[in-house]
Amino acid sequence: MSLFRSTMLRRQLLTSRSVCLRYSSTSTPENVVLPRLQADLKNAMRSKNKPALNTIRAIQAEIINASKTAKPITTDSALYSLIQKQIKSSSASIEEFRNAKREDLVEKEQAQLDVLQGYSGEIPTVGESEIDELVKSALEGLEEGKRSAGHVMGRVMSSIKGRAVDSEYVSKKIQEVVGAK
């Protein structure tokens, strides 16, 4: 091996070690579902559970696609928003299949929806009562001129940052409170 190559290898090993070390960390919520997806995929393969297998593969494909963008899915809160998006898409598909009288596809999509809802229920989210309190405190902290839905939403979402939350409920609650005042 040449001197240049051995020096480059040593340099790469030293730099990669320093990047991987973490001396302190912020308190982020523990991932529950994300690390378990691979094991669930293997279990679905062993038990020949087609709906779970297809759903987990679709989730993993979305995670891989997102890893190639600026916002990779590395936490359960990001996974929660992905799953909610897929639940919404699946629900719309079920309605379309019902309108087309395709009960076979409705059953297939419903089985996938059940798997998605199972994963969605396992991820800890911000409760509705906490969201209500955050909306009220954000509204009280703003001046009269800046009490628009956008300003309140910005404050609420910045205080929830890093945690899984039902964005539709937050938006609905902000519209109620801002519209009432």
From Swiss-Prot:
One of its GO terms (molecular function) is carbon-nitrogen ligase activity, with glutamine as amido-N-donor. GO terms for cellular component: mitochondrion. Its main location: mitochondrion. It is found in: Mitochondrion. Keywords: Mitochondrion, Transit peptide. Residues 1-23 form a transit peptide. Pfam families: YqeY. InterPro entries: Asn/Gln_tRNA_amidoTrase-B-like, GatB_Yqey_C_2, YqeY/Aim41, YqeY/Aim41_N. PANTHER family: ALTERED INHERITANCE OF MITOCHONDRIA PROTEIN 41, MITOCHONDRIAL. Belongs to the AIM41 family. This is Altered inheritance of mitochondria protein 41, mitochondrial. It comes from Pyrenophora tritici-repentis (strain Pt-1C-BFP).
